């Protein structure tokens, strides 16, 4: 089993719903450690850059607009198999398909406003973490 880091974003809908604490509680209870976090308001440049791989997709502008609609909480999570564990805790992208007890089943209202983002691979995690954090902002937790 590999100790990994993954990027997590609590999206504007979940922030507005005051679900940050409940979502963080699920991360920590699953064994993931929060090693970096910042609340931020994404602008067009930051949201567009983060989702650049989707620029040609029909949902791109709506996605950017949603991600700029309110503050987000961007975090780095660390732990054994953090990427897969985080994705399991999040649940399916569409909350209608998400398993009971997952973040999206409990806190998301639609496929568009689905509460959280998580890296889907080690490569994506490295790219996404470095997009929002510099090395000094990520603090290893040894105890």
UniProtKB/Swiss-Prot annotation:
InterPro entries: NDK-like_dom, NDK-like_dom_sf, Nucleoside_diP_kinase. GO terms for biological process: CTP biosynthetic process; GTP biosynthetic process; UTP biosynthetic process. GO terms for cellular component: cytoplasm. ATP binds at residues 11, 59, 87, 93, 104, 114. One of its GO terms (molecular function) is nucleoside diphosphate kinase activity. Its EC number is 2.7.4.6. Its cofactor is Mg(2+). The active site is at residue 117. It catalyses: a 2'-deoxyribonucleoside 5'-diphosphate + ATP = a 2'-deoxyribonucleoside 5'-triphosphate + ADP; a ribonucleoside 5'-diphosphate + ATP = a ribonucleoside 5'-triphosphate + ADP. Transmembrane segments: none annotated. Major role in the synthesis of nucleoside triphosphates other than ATP. The ATP gamma phosphate is transferred to the NDP beta phosphate via a ping-pong mechanism, using a phosphorylated active-site intermediate. PANTHER family: NUCLEOSIDE DIPHOSPHATE KINASE (PTHR46161), NUCLEOSIDE DIPHOSPHATE KINASE DDB_G0292928-RELATED (PTHR46161:SF3). Belongs to the NDK family. This is Nucleoside diphosphate kinase. It comes from Psychrobacter arcticus (strain DSM 17307 / VKM B-2377 / 273-4). The lineage of its organism: Bacteria, Pseudomonadati, Pseudomonadota, Gammaproteobacteria, Moraxellales. The gene is ndk.
């Amino acid at each position: 089993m590999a100790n990994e880091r993954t990027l997590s974003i609590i999206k504007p809908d979940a922030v507005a719903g005051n679900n940050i604490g409940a979502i963080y509680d699920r991360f920590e209870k699953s064994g993931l450690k929060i090693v970096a976090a910042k609340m931020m308001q994404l602008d067009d440049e930051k949201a567009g850059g983060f989702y650049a791989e989707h620029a040609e997709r029909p949902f791109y502008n709506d996605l950017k607009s949603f991600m700029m609609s309110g503050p987000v909480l961007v975090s780095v999570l660390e732990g054994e198999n953090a990427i897969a564990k985080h994705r399991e805790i999040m649940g399916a992208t569409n909350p209608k398909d998400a398993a009971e007890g997952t973040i999206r089943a409990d806190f998301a209202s639609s496929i568009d406003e689905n509460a959280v983002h998580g890296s889907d691979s080690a490569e994506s995690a490295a790219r996404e973490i470095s997009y929002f954090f510099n090395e000094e902002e990520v603090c290893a937790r040894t105890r």
